[in-house]
């Protein structure tokens, strides 16, 4: 039996989570390694706001159903496509929700031995 996979996603930030969301329905086998939104949680200054507007702060999924706007509506957070700054905390929470919803197979690890 082979442990071969088609794709390995290293990282679970916005790009890695988006890649996983798109790979789910392709028929390709994949594994994803990382801690969701780790850099955003650990390295960004507390209290900061994103430079991007709400409409430009979405992670990507095939159906475009898991947008920042959808998350804010679900969690009763304020949202505007333009003109309302996106807080770091809200963006992190959005990314964590996205991971739970669309990257359920995420292997939360930083151990490089589990990847090779």
Predicted regions and their residues:
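Non-catalytic DNA-binding core/recognition domains of DNA-processing enzymes
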Residues: 92
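Short loop/edge segments at beta-strand edges and connector loops
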Residues: 106-110
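Glycine-rich active-site loop/strand segments that organize a redox cofactor
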Residues: 29, 33-89
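Active-site helix/loop of acyl-thioester processing domains in fatty-acid/polyketide metabolism
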Residues: 98
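Conserved small/polar residues in nucleotide/adenosyl-binding loops
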Residues: 113-116
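N-terminal Rossmann-like FAD-binding beta1-loop-alpha1 element of flavoenzymes
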Residues: 2-32
């Amino acid at each position: 039996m082979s442990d071969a996979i088609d794709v390995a996603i290293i990282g679970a930030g916005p790009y890695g989570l988006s890649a996983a969301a798109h790979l789910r329905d392709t028929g390709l086998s994949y594994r994803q390694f990382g801690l969701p939104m780790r850099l955003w949680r650990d390295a960004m200054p507390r209290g900061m706001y994103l430079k991007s507007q709400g409409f430009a702060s979405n992670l990507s999924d095939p159906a475009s159903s898991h947008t920042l706007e959808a998350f804010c509506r679900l969690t009763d957070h304020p949202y505007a496509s333009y003109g309302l700054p996106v807080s770091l905390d809200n963006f992190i929470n959005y990314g964590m929700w996205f991971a739970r919803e669309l990257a359920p197979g995420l292997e939360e690890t930083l151990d490089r031995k589990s990847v090779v």
